Amino acid sequence: MKSLTVIILYSEREQILEESIQSIWKLNPLEIIILVPNDRRNLYEIAKKNKCHIVLMDKYSTYYEGYEASVKAAKGDVLLFVDSNFSISTNEMKKFIEPVVTNQADVVLNKIDKFVEVGKCPNMDIVWRKMLNEILSRPDLKSNSILSLPYALAKEVVVNIGFDYMKNIVLAHMNIVDQGWRINDQYAIKTLSRDETLEEEGYLVKKELSENEKEKLGKYLIGISKWIEKKGKRVGFTDAGKRRDIVQKLGECKRYPSYHQGWGMHSSIYDGKQLSVIIPVQNEEETIEQVILEARKIEPLEIIVVVNGSIDQTANIAKRLGATIIKYNERLGHNVGRAIGALEATGDILLFIDGDFSVSGSDLHHFTKAVSDGIDIALNDLNPMLNPPFYIVDIVKYMLNLAYDRPELSNGSLVAIPHAMSRSCLDAIGWETLLCPSLAQVKAILEGYRVECVHYVDVVKPNRIRLKENVSQNGHPPAVLRIIGDHVEALSYLIEQLEMDGKGD
């Protein structure tokens, strides 16, 4: 059995503090260390009376300095960190620390996901903790981390992550996971802070971030920035074979392996502006005709169909219906066709749709009209379809919108079709950026372009399920891993532009 040190964060609630100390002594720890501000005489007397080791913090000390001093002073093989604002029974604490004191685990986390009810909306903290574990390829940890008290660490873990780990606890959690320490998160103690239990008014949407939330967000971004610096801009997530090489070559010389010029019309409904419709396709012979017929209803100057990896009649059907055809025999990878279509487009308004299901002309018109009226990126407003439990793809979309302080966009994203874009926005962010939709969205936001969710179109029910991409027996399917990677790539760019990459640290 390993020896135990318990470190208590001081409490303003003196009675609960004393009760907590008495419960903790029943665990037979080597010591109890408590952080006490030197102007809180009553707390000092309680700690002294109960034979605690006291770490005094003067008014110039930071919370982190007090924590570091406590960790350095600890003598036990295991360190248990508790918040004395909550009364925890001896029996609860004994069960909680059992895996680490019996050497079955190196780290014990509070299973807070037990208290985040399925029917409730997770707040910003929960979203970002979930995202951290996704980035670390540990989705099984859900939102559980050392950001929630209580938690317990073997002393050797603390030595490896550094005694000053509280200065960047986000990065510390990431290092714990990366270093392969054995983590147990099977026991739940209900000691959630107000921030952790706070419910948002809507599902993954809020009007604005508070100053406190912005400060927390900065800490998450700084932690992730160091991780990106260590692991690369996609931190190991696949891009599922996107042909970035083809995009690069087209940037140097616009030449397609196969090209057919189609026809269109000069529109009279966009105040003199002209519309290009871009449709990337692969083996969509059963649906492409209806897709094009609906697109014709909104008066496009051109419909550009980018065919890649097809072995059916998709290209011939689209050609018969007057579309401009760009054809590649090989698969280009997700979103590369969008980028190539944008390169070829000549319109003032660009509408992006998919070829595997049709969207009515009346629905499409909401997006093109919004851009005609001055919006630069008109997104599909998917918030009405959100219901708990939330899918990880919706969570990462919301996470990115939080990162650049646009929480009202919810899960609005260039990942989803339909969406439309202004010519000026495309020229500013670059057509090639569209191969990573989330990166394109970040660039547009940072450049000051108007990005709004304008209309709801259900793209879940009609979307064709591709088993190899959308289904997995273990973990996330390939499509989800690619989307997470795209969002991490977008975060990488955002962090670099905000100069939060930590390179000066």
Model features per residue range: what roles?
Residues M1-Q22, R243-L293:
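N-proximal low-complexity "stem/linker" segments adjacent to membrane-targeting elements
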Residues S3-T5, L171, Q274-S276, E302, ...:
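Cell-envelope/extracellular polymer assembly enzymes that use nucleotide-activated donors
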Residues Q22-L30, L293-L301:
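Short, acidic, metal-binding catalytic loop of nucleotide-sugar glycosyltransferases
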Residues V36-L43, V307-A315:
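A conserved acidic beta->alpha catalytic loop
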Residues Y60-A74, Y328-A345:
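Glycine-rich, basic loop-to-helix element that forms the pyrophosphate-binding segment
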Residues D178-H266, Y270, L446-D505:
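C-terminal catalytic/acceptor-binding lobe
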